[in-house]
Amino acid sequence: MVTVREEMRKGPWTEQEDLQLVCTVRLFGDRRWDFVAKVSGLNRTGKSCRLRWVNYLHPGLKHGRMSPKEEHLIIELHARWGNRWSRIARRLPGRTDNEIKNYWRTHMRKKAQERRGDMSPSSSSSSLVYQSCLLDTVPIISMDGGDIHDDRSCMARVLKSTQSVMDGYTMDQIWKEIEAPGAPSLLGIDEGKDKACSNLPCPLLTSTMSDYSCPEVFWKIDNEETRMLATQSGYGK
């Protein structure tokens, strides 16, 4: 004769099953769980009966929310021992390792959400502060395209004005004017240059840039270098 083994029940426990298990444990104790499961008439495994008793039905268990003292102790012990829930549970009478683990996960999830909520406005605020600092520390010199264009335009106009003043004069006249001691400015070039610069919207960025816009080096030539150039060119003979 072949006996058909009945399939073990799984899933949530009913109130009737809880009462049966409590009565059986009171009679036979909470040690031999395979035997308890068999004599109780419950279609449950010994492991299932043990977990139900330890986590829910034991008379020494506490139910409900964790007290502030328990919460503080859990955080302190977790910092010391990590995820060793059974060891932590021994320091909290009436609380199971599974209950403590669930509390910790809920606590950490809530803490992470609060951290994200706090960081959201602060990050945007930090961004605004950073942008403000950038604006405060921007150099006075602006090197955008408009300024560079104006500076080049100024140089071009000055050179064009100089060229127009020099037109109509021979090289002999130019060299004589350069070599003449105590002579006035070369054919009015300085005057033309100053007039051109005064009428042009040259951007005065810095002293260096303003020197570059109307450089004196274009208008003053060392007499010794002039003589050397004249000798090489044949005009100083």
Curated annotation (Swiss-Prot):
It is found in: Nucleus. InterPro entries: EOBI/EOBII-like_plant, Homeodomain-like_sf, Myb_dom, SANT/Myb. Residues 5-57, 58-112 form the HTH myb-type domain. A motif (Bipartite nuclear localization signal 1) lies at residues 62-65. The keyword Repeat applies. Transcription factor. This is Myb-related protein MYBAS1. The lineage of its organism: Eukaryota, Viridiplantae, Streptophyta, Embryophyta, Tracheophyta.
